[in-house]
Amino acid sequence: MLEPVTRKTAFAGFEWDAGNRGKCQKHGVAIQEIEHVLTHAETLITPDPKNPAGEPRFLAIGRTRQGRYTFVVFTPRQRAAGARLRPISARYMHKREIRKYEQEIARAQER
């Protein structure tokens, strides 16, 4: 089950470097779009079921300001200055994923 992001989620920012910037932008998703999806109230987040043991990873699905449905994989990182979100990969969603997202958002709004 995917859960909506709550506005109470606090983090100090994003962690970007050459390693994740290129991988995230490889599918044409801009950094600003990724950051918006990870902070938007209608983004749904779930633990990554395919992640091997180790660093926790999460899947986020949501919409950019322009309305593009976007899929983001990220990990939270604890730093001295506070928690940061490190995007790992991002791409625009396929039609089937969009339908699933819309169903989950409707279900969350009914609660």
Summary of predicted features, one role per range:
Residues M1-R111:
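Ribonuclease/tRNase effector modules and their secretory precursors
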